[in-house]
């Protein structure tokens, strides 16, 4: 079985949106979280979806799922204090529906510009290599600093990538890593970072273009422009 774990537990402090969390902001009458969920809803290889959501917005999400015909969501789980905690909450809730060798795609609810092909590549790579980390080649030079003032390293750009999502794993393995982190008192930025903390080898799946995460106000307007450009290509054959 293949499960999509969508975490949408963030409050969106950097969006300056006082009325709604960022994942519930709408574009053309449809919330960002629904745009994201639709890719997994309509993918033949995804069997079920688990969503981690802000507790106070769970009822709102349930109504949206019904309104937009999202039927694969099998449960909605309250999120934690951090993204790490939210993913762990979701993984724990899946113990009764997932086997150790099932595939789980972990994806941001505010990353709606993925594709069917990217999901397929993640599933295939995870089955072959044990995991799949969607990554994008660096477009500019990356510098490293330990104190935020002095640059101590400029790695070759050809070797640098940005971790994106989905990040895909065998369920038993990724759950074990999160449980180890809990015992050790560790927190991670994302699942790829967690794998690195415990020395796990990771396999790259090259990201599709414009796989942005909507975090700040500018991201929303970039997303809207990109979405409308893609719509124009379909309509006008540009």
Enumerate the predicted regions with their spans.
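Hydrophobic packing residues within well-ordered alpha-helices of enzyme cores
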Residues: 15, 40, 61-65, 122, ...
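Conserved N-terminal catalytic core of the sugar/cofactor nucleotidyltransferase
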Residues: 34-101, 182-184
């Amino acid at each position: 079985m293949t499960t999509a774990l969508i975490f949408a537990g963030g409050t969106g402090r950097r969006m300056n949106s006082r009325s709604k969390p960022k994942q519930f902001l709408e574009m053309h009458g449809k919330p960002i979280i629904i745009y994201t969920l639709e890719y997994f809803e309509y993918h033949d290889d995804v069997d079920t979806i688990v969503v981690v959501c802000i507790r106070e917005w769970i009822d709102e999400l349930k109504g949206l799922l019904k309104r937009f015909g999202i039927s694969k969501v099998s449960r909605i789980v309250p999120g934690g204090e951090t993204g790490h905690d939210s993913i762990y909450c979701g993984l724990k809730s899946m113990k009764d529906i997932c086997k150790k060798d099932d595939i789980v795609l972990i994806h941001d609810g505010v990353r709606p510009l993925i594709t069917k092909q990217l999901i397929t590549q993640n599933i295939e790579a995870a089955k072959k290599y044990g995991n799949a980390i969607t990554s994008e080649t660096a477009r500019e030079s990356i510098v490293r600093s330990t104190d935020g003032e002095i640059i101590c390293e400029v790695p070759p750009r050809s070797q640098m990538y940005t971790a994106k999502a989905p990040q895909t794993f065998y369920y038993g393995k990724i759950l074990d890593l999160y449980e180890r982190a809990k015992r050790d008192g560790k927190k991670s930025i994302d699942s790829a970072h967690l794998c690195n903390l415990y020395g796990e080898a990771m396999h790259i799946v090259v990201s599709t273009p414009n796989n942005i995460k909507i975090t700040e106000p500018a991201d929303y307007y970039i997303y809207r422009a990109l979405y409308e450009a893609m719509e124009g290509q379909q309509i006008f054959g540009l």
